[in-house]
Structure formats: C-alpha cells, structure tokens
Amino acid sequence: MIKESELILNPDGSIYHINLRPEQVADTIILVGDPNRVPRVSAYFDNIEFSTQKREFCTHTGSYKGKRLTVISTGIGPDNIDIVINELDALVNIDLHTRQPKEQLTSLNIVRFGTSGSLQADIPVDSFVLSSHGLGMDNMFHSYKDSPKVREIAMEEAFIAHTSWNPLKGRPYIIACGQELKKRLLTDKVFEGITGTAPGFYGPQGRVLRLPVQDPDLNDKLHSFNHNGHRMTNLEMETSAIYGLSKLLGHQAVSLNAIIANSPTGTFTKDTKKVVEDLIVYGLEQLAK
C-alpha cells in the first residue's frame, strides 16, 4: 500500500495538485504551459464535459471530432512536469481506494503544445518543431533510479564533450520521444530535432540582465551540436522532463512547439496568437485522425 504521505488525495478523492479523479481524464492528454491557453484549446472541442483549476493546473476534458481529450496546464519548468506526469499516471495506474498499482496498466498519449525559440536560422518564426529528443539541462530526472534505462547515453556523452559541460551544473540527460505517437504528429509541415530543456529562463538560456552567465558561448554550442544527424532545433523548459517520466512510466509523449523567436536571425513573430492557434488546430487535427 502506498502511504498517504506519498499519494496525497483531496477530501473529494481527487489527486492533490491537479485536482482530478480518474474518470475525469482522457487517455489522450494535451499539455500546455499557460492556464489561459487551456480554454484556447478547448474552444475547438465539440463539448466540454468537465473543468477544474487548482493553482496553475487548469484542466478541461471533452471531445474533438469524437476523440475524447484532456487539456491541462502545467505551469513552467521540469519541477511542475514532475507533479503533473506523476499525478496523471497515478490516476490511471494506481487504484486510489486500495492505494495499490493496478495489474493492468494504461499507456497515455501525452502531447505538449508549446512555444519556443529556434536555434537554427533555417527554422523560421511561425513554423512548428516536433521534438525527436528532449535534452534536459536540469537535474530532476536523476532523482529516479531507473533513469539510465531510457536515456540516450552515447548522445549525452557527445553533448558533454561538445559543450565542455561544467559538471557543477549536473549531467545533461537525453530522452527520445514516443515513436508511435510521433508517427501521428510528424508531417512535412513540421521540422524535427532535439529540444533543449533549460531549468530557468534567464541564465540557463544564456540571457544576461545584471548577472554574468557561467558559459556565455552555450547557445552557440547548442546551435552547432549534431549527433548522427540529430541537431538542436529549439530551447524551452519542459520537454525532456515530459519525455523522461513518460518513458519510465510506459506512456507515449511528443512535444510540438510553435516557433515564436529565432536566435540566429534575431527575429520574433509578429503574431504570437496566430501561430499558437495554428499549432493548436494542427495538433488537434492530427490527434483526431
């Protein structure tokens, strides 16, 4: 039996942070960062059967063209992803009454609809990127004993050597996306590559306001990294954590990002709302097929 201090439930039986009960979650889940983006996704649903919000975790469950979907906001960063993925898995794979893992496990399809900055000049603003891999520059995933079983160790070693990575920042980890789900979401409209996941927005992504960064050349090193044809395409704050936890728990996960900025060209989208809407429509259509 899982202890009450480990699997925390609210008085209504919902799981602690995301405030959901098992029947309120679809098998296909869309993750967004911003709670305000949840209604922008569910606005396309045929119906909304359930909605709730607790802190930054806003959820709508409904259907799109007959496909039952849940969209949930995660907030920002790998730490929040740790909460959301673990609690979603608990809802489908742990009996909340007996506090025992189920014998028959459910594999979720988890898709992130995000925004990101491009690291390559040929991936312009207003385009879409599917993350073939997530490259984590945080340390969250190393908390889990079995993380080496799902990591791309050779690619990690190549990245560490290429960047002369400072070991004080912890070892980067690389996880591939869910291959079955990727087949449904990758078309000729979408670029593909490695997505870097930073543990912060400023220093960890090379931004300098008043504090100097440890490696001012990091973004140039990210831009030039290529391992067996896999290159870095974009930088954000969630994908590697989604991929790592999903793979350990037996779920399929893919991250789709709308590119709103391009570092090499110094350009920024003229219409963030439109490119996000375009990504939402694209993702929903592919999931409904």
Give residue ranges: language-model regions.
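Intrinsically disordered, low-complexity segments enriched in small residues
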Residues: 19-22, 199-205, 277-286
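Generic structural signal for well-ordered, non-membrane alpha-helical segments
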Residues: 31, 35-38, 74-81, 85, ...
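Glycine-rich beta-alpha junction loops
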Residues: 117, 134, 196-203, 241, ...
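A short, acidic, amphipathic alpha-helical segment used as a generic capping/interface helix at domain edges
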Residues: 219-229, 235, 239-245
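Zn-dependent metallopeptidase/amidohydrolase metal-coordination segment
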Residues: 240-271
